[in-house]
Each structure stands twice: as structure tokens, then as C-alpha cells.
Amino acid sequence: MTNRKAIWGVTLIALFAFTTAGCAKMGMSKASGDKLNKIHFDFDKSDIRSDQAKTLKGNAKWIKANSNHKVSIQGHCDERGTPEYNIALGDRRARAAKSYLVNLGIDADLLKTVSYGEEKPDCKKADEECYAKNRRAEFKK
């Protein structure tokens, strides 16, 4: 019996480490049920990518369960483009995320949108990996 407990304990520790590292690398939380997660966009696009749908569905579930909170959807861009263009693109991204959530049954009155354009980068390096991290919409309680 002791060996089983030891194996089970090691398995849980390994699973936790793997999950934590993997989620951090992807910019996700370990437990999507207790946190709103950001979504990402392709270069110069505001349409919701199919690989971001699961994140939005998780966010919708959280918002439905916590309808006493209003959520701000913040649109962001990478540094390429003029500040004016990026403010408009960030706005389109935030509105696209809001529209998706409304289509999932979220009350539009619980959601507000704002664009920060390129002003609040997640990553400050001038390379494609950072640009991809900065093309996002964040959801704040």
C-alpha cells in the first residue's frame, strides 16, 4: 500500500509540474474555471481563430457563473502599424470577442470593450514570437 501512495504522489507532482509549465508556455491558467483567459489573433486580423474558441467558451462559462461581475474586453496589437491604425484594430478585436461571447449567450450589458492598440505589450522584444503574444484580447473582471 505504501508503494501505491508513493507512486500516486509522484504522479500527481509530475502532472502538476507538466500542467503548470505547459499552460504557462501557452499563456493559459491551470484552472480555466477560476480565471478569464486571453485569446490571440493573426497578424492584422480581428476574426476569432478556431483554436481560440475553447478559451472563449471557458470565459463564457466563467462569466455566466459570475454574472455579478462586469468584464472589460481589452484589444491589443503588436507594434507594427501606426498608433491610430492599431487603436482601431484593437477595437475590432475587442468587439469580435464580445460578439462571440454574446453569441454564446452572454448578456452584452456585462461586457465593455476598450482598445489599447500597441500601448500595453505583453512582450517587448521585436520578433515574431513577441508580436504573436501581443496580438490579443484580454478579459478583466
Residue ranges and their predicted role:
Residues M1-K5:
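N-terminal secretory signal peptides that target proteins for export/translocation
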Residues A6-K70, E138:
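Periplasmic peptidoglycan-binding/tethering modules of Gram-negative envelope proteins
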Residues D51-G58, E84, A88, R92, ...:
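Extracytoplasmic/secreted proteins, especially bacterial periplasmic and envelope-associated proteins
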Residues N68-H76, D91-D122, R135-K141:
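A non-catalytic structural micro-motif
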Residues K124-D127:
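Short beta-alpha junctions and helix-cap segments that line functional grooves
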Residues Y131:
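Catalytic phosphate/metal-binding cores of nucleic-acid and nucleotide-processing enzymes, i.e., regions
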